[in-house]
């Protein structure tokens, strides 16, 4: 196990990684997993819930993906940032408050250096979401903001989700990782639905680990079943994600809430 020590001036947690078999895991000073990578396949996605955070691809014609802009609030192990920039060829911006996490991703998780297509910004996700700089410019917004104990979302207010919605283009989508088996999940879902409208919010069934991925569209638009099936096959064949399975475990949250 290797680690980058805590900075006394920031109070941010120690960043370290561990290797178990063929997989490398990112930790923030605890045993909780904050991200992962196959070192011999650094641009693929290892964890199921992180794969599902690419579920927004079902809403988009494949030929349009390369022209879209992605943003991650929370870098983690850089998995989504690497996938969007390297696999999909998207213009990708990641916001991360902890400089040690950025260093760890570059040292241990093969995050490429900044380029015209890839930018890592050291900053506070709440401030970025509230700022006008990126407003209405983001096509897909990944939100995965948990503390070092992974207990509950660090940012989880209606005001924050409203700011996130303002970042999106009219056809944009916010994708959030929540713990579906925790008491906070229902409250988080209620806040997201209040901001985006319940009919524009979709959720995957929880993974075995309890992660539920929620997708919220700025403007509700659902492709026809034939288009969804065609896109799922394209996603599997070209990008190596289990999108056909997604169609069986993804549903509008309004149905589950009885609306």
Where are the regions a protein language model picked out?
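A generic structural signal for alpha->beta connector loops
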Residues: 89-91, 115-117, 171, 198-200, ...
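A short, flexible beta-alpha/helix-coil linker loop
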Residues: 31-35, 146-149, 174
């Amino acid at each position: 196990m290797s680690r980058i020590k805590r900075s006394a001036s920031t109070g941010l947690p120690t960043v370290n990684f561990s290797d178990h078999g063929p997989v490398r895991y990112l930790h923030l000073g605890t045993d909780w997993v904050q991200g992962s990578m196959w070192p011999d396949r650094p641009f693929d996605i290892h964890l199921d819930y992180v794969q599902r955070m690419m579920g927004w691809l079902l809403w988009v014609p494949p030929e349009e993906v390369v022209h879209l802009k992605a943003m991650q609030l929370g870098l983690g192990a850089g998995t989504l940032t690497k996938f969007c920039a390297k696999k999909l060829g998207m213009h990708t911006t990641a916001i991360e408050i902890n400089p040690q996490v950025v260093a760890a991703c570059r040292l241990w998780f093969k995050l490429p250096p900044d380029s015209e297509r890839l930018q890592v910004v050291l900053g506070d996700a709440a401030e970025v979401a509230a700022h006008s700089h990126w407003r209405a410019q983001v096509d897909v917004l990944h939100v995965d903001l948990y503390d070092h104990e992974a207990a509950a979302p660090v940012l989880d207010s209606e005001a924050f989700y409203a700011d996130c919605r303002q970042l999106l283009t009219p056809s944009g989508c916010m994708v959030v990782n929540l713990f579906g088996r925790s008491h906070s999940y229902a409250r988080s879902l209620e806040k997201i639905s209040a901001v985006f409208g319940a009919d524009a919010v979709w959720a995957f069934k929880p993974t075995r680990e309890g992660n539920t991925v929620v997708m919220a569209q700025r403007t509700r638009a659902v492709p026809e079943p034939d288009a969804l099936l065609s896109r799922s096959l394209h996603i599997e064949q070209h990008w190596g994600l289990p999108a056909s399975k997604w169609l069986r475990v993804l549903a509008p949250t309004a149905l589950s809430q009885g609306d």
